């Protein structure tokens, strides 16, 4: 029974990704005697009956997700999506975040965790499947799976989407300070450029860091050749002398404050940064980049949860 509750959350998570849920914005007056207004967001769904069926069952579930993926209402006018989910379904979401796939993996592998929903990346999903860490999904309980684009339903890491439902995809490029760095000079090799020593940030996760080094060396970004991996590792060691820090979400503060001027990161996050800081730009080098998919999964440890009680 618990799995059905969890699958309901997966389906809700897919609403925004598939377009079945709508975030509406409207203006409300701050006071009766002023013309100042503020934008307020709310969520509506096409089939509310499906999502309200557990409303009075006193259910709570634990979600472990990337740090910047779901709005928490901390910005003015931006909704708290988990709170909206609870309002709609009656299901309480206990929400925590991680910065890397490796952090997620270590937490689950160490045991003692009771997460119901996780959102790892493609390569980590493949590893978790091989290590029997993920629960097979019953697609009949995930109606919004039908709204996922077909090209994302079949992949090397989970060929039939037996264990995962694609949530988002993106690419990696380079965020840079346009007042210091010329776009025409940007390739992956700029991350090794001694002219910018101490002002370069680098990924604090092996998958994306190795992909950049492999690209520079002309290797497949998915190589499993031990010699090529060793050479990529040496390339990354060479870079260390020019790197200010190895980061993930810390990039927002460091690039925003001007502490660093060059950093590889994800396209979606780059858009967020550029919206806030007009001097930042984003480039995908001509030599190419990697495409990633993050997907919703249920870890086998979900069965350790106590079954829900009536409210």
Positions of PLM-derived features:
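Bacterial N-terminal signal peptides
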Residues: 9-17
């Amino acid at each position: 029974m618990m799995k059905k509750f969890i699958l309901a959350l997966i389906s809700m998570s897919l609403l925004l990704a598939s377009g079945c849920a709508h975030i509406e914005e409207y203006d409300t007056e701050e006071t009766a005697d002023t013309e100042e207004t503020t934008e307020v967001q709310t969520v509506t769904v096409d089939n509310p009956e499906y999502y309200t069926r557990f409303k009075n069952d006193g259910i709570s579930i634990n979600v472990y997700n990337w740090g910047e993926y779901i709005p928490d209402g901390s910005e003015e006018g931006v909704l708290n999506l988990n709170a909206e989910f609870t309002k709609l379904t009656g299901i309480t979401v206990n929400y925590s975040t991680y910065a890397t796939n490796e952090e997620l993996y270590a937490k689950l592998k160490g045991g003692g965790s009771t997460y119901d929903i996780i959102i790892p990346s493609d390569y980590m999903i493949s590893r978790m499947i091989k290590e029997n860490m993920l629960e097979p999904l019953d697609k009949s309980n995930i109606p919004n799976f039908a709204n996922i684009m077909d090209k994302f339903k079949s992949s090397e890491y989970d060929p039939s989407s037996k264990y995962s439902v694609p949530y988002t995809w993106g690419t990696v490029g380079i965020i840079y300070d346009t007042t210091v760095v010329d776009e025409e000079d940007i390739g992956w090799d700029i991350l090794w450029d001694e002219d910018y020593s101490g002002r370069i940030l680098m990924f604090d996760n092996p998958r994306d860091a190795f992909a950049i080094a492999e690209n520079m060396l002309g290797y497949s970004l998915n190589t499993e050749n031990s010699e090529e991996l060793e050479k990529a590792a040496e390339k990354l060691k060479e870079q260390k002398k020019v790197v200010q820090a190895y980061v993930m979400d810390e990039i927002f503060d460091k690039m925003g404050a001007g502490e660093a001027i060059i950093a590889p990161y994800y396209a979606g996050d780059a858009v967020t940064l550029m919206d806030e800081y007009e001097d930042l730009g984003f480039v995908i080098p001509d030599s190419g980049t990697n495409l990633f998919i993050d997907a919703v999964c249920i870890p086998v440890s979900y069965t350790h949860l106590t079954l829900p009680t009536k409210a």
